Amino acid sequence: MVVHLISLLTQTLALIILSLPSIINTSQLDYDTLVFKQCDPLDANILQKATTKSPNYSNQNLFLRAQALSSFLRKLESESSRSKFLKTLVGNEKHAVSGWFQCREDYPSEICHKCVGDLREISSRSCGNATSARIHLRGCHLIYKFERIDTPGAQVNNHHKYKLFETPEHGLIHKICDGATAETFPGFEEMRTEALTAAETGVVDGHGFYEDSYKLLHVVAQCDGHVEACDCGECISSAAAAAAEECRWSIAGQIYLEGCHVGYTYHPHELPNDSYHEEGSKVNTGKSLAIVVGGVAALVFVAIFFMFLKSLRKKGDDC
């Protein structure tokens, strides 16, 4: 009996140890930190038409508008469990919402789904009355705008009748430059230029995503899912130029353009970590894994010890 229990507990411990790396890696992902949000104010023209005479029109219009946005966000959240990117248009007889969500390509599907759920909450809480919004978290982002439907009784059933956002022009949207500088480190600018140049070709080969370490820099680059390969490379090239200009001596920087974003982190005294190393995330995976495994093993051996004592006591009672 004791031998059987020991065997069972040993197998359980082995399964736990095998699953721990993925659990710890997932828990490390800083996917839900807000990077920035932009909510454009509500346009009064959306709430009323000059030809409208009904006093209840504004309330009804607000309801239909909120309904369209809610349907749009629900669809994105639902699809995020199966896809890392979705560009779509959803609406009713008065309003349509066009836009997309995108998750960081190397994050697991469950993290993508959680991240888009957070986007939906932030949008509802902070941008509920906006005509357009852009929300970026560390692990995903959301962009949408309202499309005016002027035809009475029009239904948004055929997406080809309505335009989504046009091809981006790679304009600067947001930047984050670390306050610490690398001015005293020789060769920093050249190293960053080489690392970001590698990202330009990397996103083309990687179908819009690149994450790698180059010498003492860690670089992450990604284009929006609807951006073609050649445009993606050009966008990252523009982002690299913006990083050199806007964050010249910063040891870490993030540049967000229309269509893509790029981030880099400089590690002058250590080699960058592998995948999932993001700005501000420096968790020691090996140490965490050792602590957890040790704790689980201790619990298992304590359980075996008590079972052994119980077995001896039972034998004594039988005598």
From Swiss-Prot:
<dbReference type="InterPro" id="IPR051378">
    <property type="entry name" value="Cell2Cell_Antifungal"/>
</dbReference>
<keyword id="KW-0472">Membrane</keyword>
<keyword id="KW-0812">Transmembrane</keyword>
<keyword id="KW-0945">Host-virus interaction</keyword>
<feature type="signal peptide">
    <location>
        <begin position="1"/>
        <end position="26"/>
    </location>
</feature>
<feature type="transmembrane region" description="Helical">
    <location>
        <begin position="289"/>
        <end position="309"/>
    </location>
</feature>
<dbReference type="InterPro" id="IPR002902">
    <property type="entry name" value="GNK2"/>
</dbReference>
<keyword id="KW-0965">Cell junction</keyword>
<dbReference type="GO" id="GO:0009506">
    <property type="term" value="C:plasmodesma"/>
</dbReference>
<feature type="domain" description="Gnk2-homologous 2">
    <location>
        <begin position="170"/>
        <end position="269"/>
    </location>
</feature>
<keyword id="KW-0677">Repeat</keyword>
<keyword id="KW-0813">Transport</keyword>
<feature type="disulfide bond">
    <location>
        <begin position="115"/>
        <end position="140"/>
    </location>
</feature>
<feature type="domain" description="Gnk2-homologous 1">
    <location>
        <begin position="45"/>
        <end position="149"/>
    </location>
</feature>
<dbReference type="GO" id="GO:0005886">
    <property type="term" value="C:plasma membrane"/>
</dbReference>
<feature type="topological domain" description="Cytoplasmic">
    <location>
        <begin position="310"/>
        <end position="319"/>
    </location>
</feature>
<feature type="disulfide bond">
    <location>
        <begin position="235"/>
        <end position="260"/>
    </location>
</feature>
<comment type="similarity">
    <text>Belongs to the cysteine-rich repeat secretory protein family. Plasmodesmata-located proteins (PDLD) subfamily.</text>
</comment>
<dbReference type="InterPro" id="IPR038408">
    <property type="entry name" value="GNK2_sf"/>
</dbReference>
<feature type="disulfide bond">
    <location>
        <begin position="223"/>
        <end position="232"/>
    </location>
</feature>
<keyword id="KW-1133">Transmembrane helix</keyword>
<comment type="subunit">
    <text>(Microbial infection) Interacts with Grapevine fanleaf virus (GFLV) 2B-MP.</text>
</comment>
<feature type="disulfide bond">
    <location>
        <begin position="177"/>
        <end position="247"/>
    </location>
</feature>
<protein>
    <recommendedName>
        <fullName>Plasmodesmata-located protein 4</fullName>
    </recommendedName>
</protein>
<keyword id="KW-1003">Cell membrane</keyword>
<dbReference type="Pfam" id="PF01657">
    <property type="entry name" value="Stress-antifung"/>
</dbReference>
<keyword id="KW-1015">Disulfide bond</keyword>
<feature type="topological domain" description="Extracellular">
    <location>
        <begin position="27"/>
        <end position="288"/>
    </location>
</feature>
<feature type="disulfide bond">
    <location>
        <begin position="103"/>
        <end position="112"/>
    </location>
</feature>
<feature type="region of interest" description="Necessary and sufficient for plasmodesmal targeting">
    <location>
        <begin position="289"/>
        <end position="309"/>
    </location>
</feature>
<keyword id="KW-0732">Signal</keyword>
<comment type="function">
    <text>Modulates cell-to-cell trafficking.</text>
</comment>
<feature type="disulfide bond">
    <location>
        <begin position="39"/>
        <end position="127"/>
    </location>
</feature>
